[in-house]
Structure formats: structure tokens, C-alpha cells
């Protein structure tokens, strides 16, 4: 600021000097000393810049408030300039004082003021001198620093020289290495060339192998087509023989009619027109038969041509494929054996017919012969051919037209042919015997039914049908309306008796008044039975009549003793003392609230109270859930199976049974000291597997089975021990013991989308630096879960809200806001509904052998709240 003011003051003084100089020149000129040719300076002199400069000088001086700054500024003004300005101001002031009488200032006052200004200027000069000395010291320090930097610069230059020398040596080494690299590249090019040649040879060999495979497939297809053509040819020949026999029968019928006409011509002359019409009808039928015969002949010729073409193609294939020539010749000589070997692994229900065909076809009254083995096997394999629909349509059309596809071998003088005009149509093939054996005996397999599709229908049935169901099906279709409705043994046949039968069926006459000795003699020892608790219960024999009447009474009418016995069997024996005092009948428990149970029965344990409430609710709604069939002892074994044995004591103490598993909430698990998020998910997936398998106690597999054919529907039922066995089978036996107590089972592996191979590696304590081992585990894990579950896990990982599953994540209870404080008294601990695995309305849709889609379709694990378990404390 001071320097700017000094510069401005200096510029103003210089301008004032110039102005004063110009003024003097003007005064000289006004005195007449200038040349006559020069113009007056007043003509170009402008007083306004001087005024502006004086005003700027005043403003600059006003800005300098401190006297030291003003003194420093005055010390910088040149002496002549200051003297001139002083004189100029004194002259102007004297003129002003001379012209204005109002000014009272004297020269003494001005002198005193100037002396004060001088002192301030001296002070400013001393300050500036001190500043100059300080600047000199700084300059000396900077010179010392400069010398030090110069020394460092010299040292750096020396190091640079050394670095240049080392760099030149490195460059020489680099050149040597470049030459070696070039040599290695040449060698690499040679090796790559050899590798390409080897790959080319291998590719050609693979192409040859692929061509051989295609040729083998074509040969198999041609062999299959040849068998089909042969079967068609045989069937056509059989139809031709049948048609020829029908033609012969029609000829015999025509001859018989002609003889009858010749004998009765004289007696029945009035019916001549009717006979002509009958003859015309017979002629038309004969013509249709002849046309059908011609059609069959034409088809035989077409099939013969196709067979010849096939033989030519077979010869070409035999020429192109030398090693398969022997196989083709063997197949040509023995087509039945070759086709049976080709179909060794494809078993169809026709084999049941092959086993029971001889005794069923042994009736001498039935014309059609038994089908050969090759024919049945060929029919069983027609699913593999592209002409299956044609074959089916042909067989159905034949039967709809009334043509039997197999030749009838009955003699011409058979009474059956004498009674029926159309022997080819299905009808009453054998008369009924008096004892009804014909109606009960199964028909022959070789005989066509009313629709002509018995074998086709059998081919489409499942392999689980037994012989009885097949025989009933065939008998119902072949005998038409003759046989009665014989339904197989169904559950409808075991209906409960109604009315008085139901009442008499419940009464047992026995010597004992308490229990059935006959059933106890055959019964096995079981938990909770009479033989297992043979102490106090068998001694209660006083109220035998009341117990008899109580046996089938509803729960509301149970006596106090029976309710107490039920509580003992239920695992809540510690509350029997209070129950004897409070419970008067079963109706007391049915109408009791959880608060009443806590107050009157002393049930302080929330899960005991929940167990009793659920049991009473199930009895009140009259529904018997499968989850109530097993007790808390089974639940402890189930915890072993899912890999969480560390919680057995808590679950056993809380008496958690299968019904409670359905209604377990997040708060219940937290009360059971299950705080790990991974363990919550493990229990959730395990309960879901129980839901899908209808709470089958043996749904979890503990022992390894066939390792080659593993599907996700089987893996989802693996126990923790089975997963450890799988780890041993994939060469990770040393890490398998780490899964004990981890909660990893098949349901968690398949159903939890966030459980990946990395999660399993983390649970197995495989170090992250062992990348090959982790990659091996991930590969085996993806092959185990299948492509569907793998794709679902990848989509879950790709979602923006994905958080990886860790072993340290904890589940915290839900934090209630201010709006929930009013509901704290209304909803207690055991009344929450945030179930760990909510029950679906379609729990019973999927069986234990349901595929993986059934598990996923019922799975409640896709909720987005899963990702925030460790924050809100709920799973579903």
C-alpha cells in the first residue's frame, strides 16, 4: 500500500513539475521574451489535468492515515520537486492570503506545521533504514542457501554421471537380452508352427471320428427304418392275407347265396327285386374289397421299393465304413438280436406283455397268433422313429374301418364264422360259461380291442402301472359292454363305515377296562406308549367307565386327569400341578388366552406358552397337521442333520416340536440364542425343505448314493453329513470337518441365492491365496447345483442391492419407532407373525421326488428383505 502511494505521489509530482515548467514558459512568453513566431502557451495549456492531479494527490494522502507511512512517502520525494512544490504552494497561499482577508494563518504556524511534517519524514526514513538492514540480512541468508544448493547441484551432477555410466551398461545388457529374446521368438515360432500342424492333424482326426459317428448314427437310423419297413411289410402281408381270407369268405357267401337263390327261385318269385338288391349290395361290397386289395398290393410294392432303396444305401454305407461291415452283416442276419441289444437300456411296459403273453394266448378258440418278440420290441421303440404318428393313424384307421390287422386262423367251418357275417369286427369272441369264468378271465393280448390301440395306449402309460391295472384296462376295452365295471383296488374302496357300522366298529369286548391287551401284545415299544410308561398310568383303574366314555369325546369334554396326561405326553409335565388346580375340563384350555396360561398355569417360558397355544388352536380348528406327529426329540436330531447341533440344548429346553417349526419367528430364534444370519437362513431353508416334502421325517439323506447322477432335487435333501461326504469325494477331505456346526446343508446350498462357492470356501477356511483350490471348489460347486440355480445366483450377485453372505453377520431385533409404542401392550413376544419360513397355501403340492423347480416354486427365499437381515432382524 505504501509503495503504491509513493508511486502515485511521484507521478503526481512529476506531472506538477511539468505543469510548473509549462507555467514558467508561459510567464516568460507573456513577458515578451518568446519569439514572435511562436504561439502563446495559453492556447494549448489546459488547467484541468493539474487540478485532477492535485485532487488525486489529496486522496492518496488521505488514504495514508499513519504518520510513519506519510514520513516514508515524503522521504522518497526528490528534493527539488518538493522545494518547487513548496514554493509554488507558498506563492499561491501568499496570493490567497493577499486576496482573502478571512485567512488568519501566519507564517509561524505554517513553519511549525512543516517542522512536524519534517519530523514525521525523518521518522519514516529511520523506519525505512531498519527495513533495508533487515532486507540485507535476508539477502545474506539467501546467499548462504544458494551456496548450499550449489554444492548439492554439484553432487547431483556427479550422481548423474554415474547414472549415465550405469545406464550405458544396462543398455548393453538390454541389447544382449534382445538378441536372446529374438532367438527365443524364432524358437517359439517354430514350436507354434509344429503345434499348428499337430492341431491340424488332430482336427482332421476329430473330423474323421465325427464323420464315423455320423455314419454310425445314420446306420442305426437306417437299421431302425429297415426294421420299421419290415414290420410294415409283415403287417401289410398279414392284412393282405386277412383281406384274401375275407374275399374267400365273401366268395363262399356269394356261392351260398347263389345256391339259395337257385333253390328258392320258384318258391319266392315275388321277392325277385329284393334278391337283386341284395346281390347288388354284395357286388358293391366285393368291389370295395377288391379295391382295398389293390390298394394293399400297391402299398406292398411301395414298401418293396423302399426296402430296395434301403438296401442300396446300406451297401453304400458298408463301402464307406469298413469296420462296421461285420456289424451290419450280423444285424442283417439276426435283426431281432441286434435290435434288442440296441434297445437294452430302453424298457417299456410291453415287456410285461411279453412275460404274460404265452398263457393268455393259449386259448384255442381265439384266432390271432401271439405277436413275435421282434414285433413287440419294434412297437415299443416306435417312439424313436419319425413315422410314429403315421403308424398310429394307420392302425386306428384300420380298426375304425373294421379290418383286423392280424390274420384270423380259425377254420372255415367254425360256428363263430357261421353265426357272424363280419368275423373281422370285434365282438363276442367266446361264450360266457355258467360260472362266469369267461367274464373274469383276462383276454388275450394279441386280440385287438374296440379302438384298435391297446398297445399304443399301453406305450403311452407310465411304467409304474402293475399287471392288474393293465389287464383291467385291456379287458374293459376289448370286451365292450359285455364285462362289468371292474375297478381296481382304490382308496375309495376302503371307506369308513357309516351309521351303525361305525358305532359297532369302535366297540371292543375285552377283559380290561383300561387298554386293549390284544393290540398291546402285537405293538412294538415306542415312546409315549403304554408299555413305555407302565408306572402311574396303568395304575389308574378306578374310573374305567369314565375313561371308556372319554375315549372318543371331543377335547372340550376331556376330564382334568386326561388333560394332565395329555400335558405329560406333550412334554409340559412341569405344569401339571397347576393344571390340576385350574383346569376343570378341556374347555378351559380351549377358551384360555396366553395371559391366562401365564397367570393360572405359571407358564413363564414364552415358547412353552406358544407350544400350548398352537396345540390348542389345532385342536380347536379340528385340523391334524403333519408337523405335530413328531416331538421335540426329533427336532434335536433334525438340528444334527442340518449342521446346527450347538442349539440342541436351547431347542430341547424350549420343547420345540415340528408344529412349532412352522410358526418359528425371528424373535423366537433370537430367544433361542440363534443370532447368526447364516444360521437363520439355514433353519429357514431346512424348514422349507420339510414343507415341500410334507414333513417327511426321513426326507434328508445322510449317506451317499449314486454320485454319477446327481440332480438339484436330490442335492436339496442333503444333510450336513452328506455335504461333508461330497467334499471328501471332490478331494477336499481335509476341509470337510470345518463344516461341523456351520449349518450348511443341501437346502441352503440350492435355495439360498446368496450362498455361492466363495461362501462355502470361506466356511471351509480355505485361504484366499489358494486360488487354484478355490477355483476347483467353485467348479465342483457349480456342477453340483445345476445351471438353473447357478444362473439365479449370478443374477442375485449382479443386482445393485446385493450384499455378500458372511459368517459374521448378526441378526438384530427390530427397532420400534415412536409410532409403534402404542402396539407394545397389544402384541407380546409370542404373538409376532414375522415367521422365519411362512407357510404357503400350496405346501402339499410338491412331493419328495419333485424336481428342483418345485422347490423353487414354493420357495419364500426370494424376498428382497433378505439383504437387510442384519439391520431389521427379520427374514421374510
Swiss-Prot record:
Q: Which residues form the SAM domain?
A: 558-622, 630-693, 718-783
Q: Where is the composition biased (Polar residues)?
A: 473-489
Tissues of expression:
Widely expressed.
Q: Which GO terms describe its biological process?
A: neuromuscular junction development
Output the InterPro entries linked to this UniProt entry: Liprin (IPR029515), Liprin-beta_SAM_rpt_1 (IPR037617), Liprin-beta_SAM_rpt_2 (IPR037618), Liprin-beta_SAM_rpt_3 (IPR037619), SAM (IPR001660), SAM/pointed_sf (IPR013761)
GO MF terms held by the record: identical protein binding
Positions of the region Disordered?
A: 356-376, 425-451, 470-500, 527-553
What sections of the sequence does the record tag as coiled-coil?
A: 101-313
The cellular component terms of Gene Ontology attached to this UniProt record, alphabetical and capped at eight, are: cytosol; extracellular space; presynaptic active zone
Q: Where is the signal peptide?
A: none
Q: Which residues carry this modification: Phosphoserine?
A: 329, 363, 387, 512
UniProtKB keywords: Coiled coil, Phosphoprotein, Repeat
What is the recorded function of this protein according to its Swiss-Prot or TrEMBL entry? Answer: May regulate the disassembly of focal adhesions. Did not bind receptor-like tyrosine phosphatases type 2A.
Notes concerning its domains: The N-terminal coiled coil regions mediate homodimerization preferentially and heterodimerization type beta/beta. The C-terminal, non-coiled coil regions mediate heterodimerization type beta/alpha.
Q: Which family does it belong to?
A: Belongs to the liprin family. Liprin-beta subfamily.
How does it associate, per the subunit comment?
Answer: Forms homodimers and heterodimers.
- State what protein this is by name: Liprin-beta-2
Q: What is the lineage of its organism?
A: Eukaryota, Metazoa, Chordata, Craniata, Vertebrata
Gene (name only): PPFIBP2
Amino acid at each position: 500500500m505504501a509503495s503504491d502511494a509513493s508511486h502515485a505521489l511521484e507521478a503526481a509530482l512529476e506531472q506538477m513539475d511539468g505543469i510548473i515548467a509549462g507555467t514558467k514558459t508561459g510567464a516568460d512568453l507573456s513577458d515578451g521574451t518568446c519569439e514572435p513566431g511562436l504561439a502563446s502557451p495559453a492556447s494549448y495549456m489546459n488547467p484541468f489535468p493539474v487540478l485532477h492531479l492535485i485532487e488525486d494527490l489529496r486522496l492518496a494522502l488521505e488514504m495514508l492515515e499513519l504518520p510513519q507511512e506519510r514520513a516514508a512517502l515524503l522521504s522518497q520525494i526528490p528534493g527539488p520537486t518538493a522545494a518547487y512544490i513548496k514554493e509554488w504552494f507558498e506563492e499561491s497561499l501568499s496570493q490567497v492570503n493577499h486576496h482573502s482577508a478571512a485567512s488568519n494563518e501566519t507564517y509561524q504556524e505554517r513553519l511549525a506545521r512543516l517542522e512536524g511534517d519534517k519530523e514525521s519524514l525523518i521518522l519514516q526514513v529511520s523506519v525505512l533504514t531498519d527495513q533495508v538492514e533487515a532486507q540485507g540480512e535476508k539477502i545474506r541468508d539467501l546467499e548462504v542457501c544458494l551456496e548450499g544448493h550449489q554444492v548439492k547441484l554439484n553432487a547431483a551432477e556427479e550422481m548423474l554421471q554415474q547414472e549415465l555410466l550405469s545406464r550405458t551398461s544396462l543398455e548393453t545388457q538390454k541389447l544382449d537380452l534382445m538378441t536372446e529374446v529374438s532367438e527365443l521368438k524364432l524358437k517359439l515360432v517354430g514350436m507354434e508352427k509344429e503345434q499348428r500342424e499337430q492341431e491340424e492333424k488332430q482336427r482332421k482326426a476329430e473330423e474323421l471320428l465325427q464323420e464315423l459317428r455320423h455314419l454310425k448314427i445314420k446306420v442305426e437310423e437306417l437299421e431302425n427304418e429297415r426294421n420299421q419297413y419290415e414290420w410294415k411289410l409283415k403287417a401289410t402281408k398279414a392284412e393282405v392275407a386277412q383281406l384274401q381270407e375275407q374275399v374267400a369268405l365273401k366268395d363262399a357267401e356269394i356261392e351260398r347265396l347263389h345256391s339259395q337263390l337257385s333253390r328258392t327261385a320258384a318258391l319266392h318269385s315275388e321277392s325277385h327285386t329284393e334278391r337283386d338288391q341284395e346281390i347288388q349290395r354284395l357286388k358293391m361290397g366285393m368291389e370295395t374289397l377288391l379295391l382295398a386289395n389293390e390298394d394293399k398290393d400297391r402299398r406292398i410294392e411301395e414298401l418293396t421299393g423302399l426296402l430296395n432303396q434301403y438296401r442300396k444305401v446300406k451297401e453304400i454305407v458298408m463301402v464307406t465304413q469298413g469296420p462296421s461291415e461285420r456289424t451290419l452283416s450280423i444285424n442283417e442276419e439276426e435283426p431281432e438280436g441286434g435290435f434288442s441289444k440296441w434297445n437294452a437300456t430302453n424298457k417299456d411296459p410291453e415287456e410285461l406283455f411279453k412275460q404274460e403273453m404265452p398263457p393268455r394266448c393259449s386259448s384255442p378258440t381265439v384266432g390271432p397268433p401271439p405277436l413275435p418278440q421282434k414285433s413287440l420290441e419294434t412297437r415299443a421303440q416306435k417312439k424313436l422313429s419319425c413315422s410314429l404318428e403315421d403308424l398310429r393313424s394307420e392302425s386306428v384307421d384300420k380298426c375304425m374301418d373294421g379290418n383286423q390287422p392280424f390274420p384270423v386262423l380259425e377254420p372255415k367251418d367254425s360256428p363263430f364264422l357261421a353265426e357272424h357275417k363280419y368275423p373281422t369286427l370285434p365282438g363276442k369272441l367266446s361264450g360266457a360259461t355258467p360260472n362266469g369264468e369267461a367274464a373274469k378271465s383276462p383276454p388275450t393280448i394279441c386280440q385287438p380291442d374296440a379302438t384298435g390301440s391297446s398297445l399304443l395306449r399301453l406305450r403311452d402309460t407310465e411304467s409304474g402301472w402293475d399287471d392288474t391295472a393293465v389287464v383291467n384296462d385291456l379287458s374293459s376295452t376289448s370286451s365292450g359292454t359285455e364285462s362289468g365295471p371292474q375297478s381296481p383296488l382304490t382308496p375309495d374302496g376302503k371307506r369308513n363305515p357309516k351309521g351303525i357300522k361305525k358305532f359297532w366298529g369302535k366297540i371292543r369286548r375285552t377283559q380290561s377296562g383300561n387298554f386293549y391287551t390284544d393290540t398291546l401284545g402285537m405293538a412294538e415299544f415306542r415312546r409315549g406308549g403304554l408299555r413305555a410308561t407302565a408306572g402311574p398310568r396303568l395304575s389308574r383303574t378306578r374310573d374305567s367307565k369314565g375313561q371308556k366314555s372319554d375315549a372318543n369325546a371331543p377335547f372340550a369334554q376331556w376330564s382334568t386327569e386326561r388333560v394332565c396326561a395329555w400335558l405329560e405326553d406333550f412334554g409340559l409335565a412341569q405344569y401339571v400341578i397347576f393344571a390340576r388346580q385350574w383346569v376343570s375340563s378341556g374347555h378351559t384350555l380351549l377358551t384360555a388366552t396366553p395371559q391366562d396360561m401365564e397367570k393360572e398355569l405359571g407358564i413363564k417360558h414364552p415358547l412353552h406358552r406358544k407350544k400350548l397355544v398352537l396345540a390348542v388352536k389345532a385342536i380347536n380348528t379340528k385340523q391334524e397337521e403333519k408337523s405335530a406327529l413328531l416331538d421335540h426329540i426329533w427336532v434335536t436330531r433334525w438340528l444334527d442333520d442340518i449342521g446346527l447341533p450347538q442349539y440342541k440344548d436351547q431347542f430341547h429346553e424350549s420343547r420345540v416340536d415340528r408344529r412349532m417349526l412352522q410358526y418359528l419367528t425371528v424373535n423366537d430364534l433370537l430367544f433361542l440364542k440363534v443370532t447368526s444370519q447364516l444360521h437363520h437362513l439355514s433353519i429357514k431353508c431346512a424348514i422349507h425343505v420339510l414343507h415341500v416334502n410334507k414333513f417327511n421325517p426321513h426326507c434328508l439323506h445322510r449317506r451317499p448314493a449314486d454320485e454319477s447322477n446327481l440332480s438339484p432335487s436330490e442335492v436339496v435333501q442333503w444333510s450336513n453329513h452328506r455335504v461333508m461326504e461330497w467334499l471328501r469325494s471332490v478331494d477336499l477331505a481335509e476341509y470337510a470337518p470345518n463344516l461341523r456346526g456351520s449349518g450348511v446343508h443341501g437346502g441352503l446350498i440350492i435355495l439360498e441365492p446368496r450362498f455361492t462357492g466363495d461362501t462355502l470356501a470361506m466356511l471351509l477356511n480355505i485361504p484366499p491365496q489358494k486360488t487354484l483350490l478355490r477355483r476347483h471348489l467353485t467348479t465342483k460347486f457349480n456342477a453340483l447345483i445345476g445351471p438353473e440355480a447357478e444362473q439365479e445366483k449370478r443374477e442375485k450377485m449382479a443386482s445393485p442391492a446385493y450384499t455378500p453372505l458372511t459368517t459374521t453377520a448378526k441378526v438384530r431385533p427390530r427397532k420400534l419407532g415412536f409410532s409403534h409404542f402404542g402396539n407394545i401392550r397389544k402384541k407380546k413376544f409370542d404373538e409376532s407373525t414375522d415367521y422365519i419360513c411362512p407357510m404357503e397355501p400350496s405346501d402339499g403340492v410338491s412331493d419328495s421326488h419333485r424336481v428342483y423347480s418345485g422347490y423353487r416354486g414354493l420357495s419364500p427365499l426370494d424376498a428382497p428383505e433378505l439383504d437387510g437381515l442384519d439391520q431389521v432382524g427379520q427374514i421374510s
